């Protein structure tokens, strides 16, 4: 007669997490402390310790992890406002939203600067930035946001699982402040600049409540969106970066990447528009992305926008206010040991 092997409590937990889209490898890498080992996993009480860490890091209900008959449940105290592409099921973004919301909550709790609501027009914000900078760039927009107590974080460490979608940008409100979360995995500062400006537009236009745990999630930021709030956020971003929301750098003929890069530097200097933004604007209006992407590579050599964003975050958090587990998790989830 064959012996029936009964899975351990930890293996059962891993399997239940796998069933909701959290692979064991991801859970062990992101959800458990660095001292965790196979030997400890076999000890009495390991399941309780593991569940406590995993629930805190991934925004999961603790009791649903401890009860072996339950399906693990993500915890969101308010229904996110999703801005979706046609055909996207909101449920497919629930996991990424919950995990990113926890990162935003941790960041908000440790932000050094108090939140100062922005009582300026878009034109006045642009003018304020240009008083200190030649262009509105990712770096200068980060300066502005942090000066008003609005953290900006880049987080893209989501599990890879069938049916689980990621998003490009989010505004999450915790501890009476908005937090901008960028999740597009892209090294270009100009691309992430537009998404950050778009998310700032949602804040300026009052598209979400500043009460705790409110979320606005942009699956994808597109210039051609017909959603009224997306149109308004795009208009804010365009006016902030270009000076006018209807400004176009389209040309009659198609440019090569090198010619576009030279053109972008020339007209960008005159118009006080970042050359990378000029190149993207050309690509949007001409639908000539080969040259636009090539120009960005020439204009932004060796760029690492996610690192730039999180390096700034590293300097603006009160790390002593966080417990050891949250410190370790942020460093791991945001790649801070590499910035």
Identify the residue ranges that each predicted region occupies:
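Active-site hotspot residues in diverse enzymes, especially metal/ion-binding acidic/histidine motifs
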Residues: 1-339
